[in-house]
From Swiss-Prot:
Has a role in the neurosecretory system of the vena cava. InterPro entries: Neurohypophysial_hormone_CS. This is Cephalotocin. The lineage of its organism: Eukaryota, Metazoa, Spiralia, Lophotrochozoa, Mollusca. Keywords: Amidation, Disulfide bond, Hormone, Secreted. Its main location: secreted.
Length: 9
């Protein structure tokens, strides 16, 4: 995951 591209984190 990176910035806010994570679906859960």
């Amino acid at each position: 995951c990176y910035f806010r591209n994570c679906p859960i984190g």
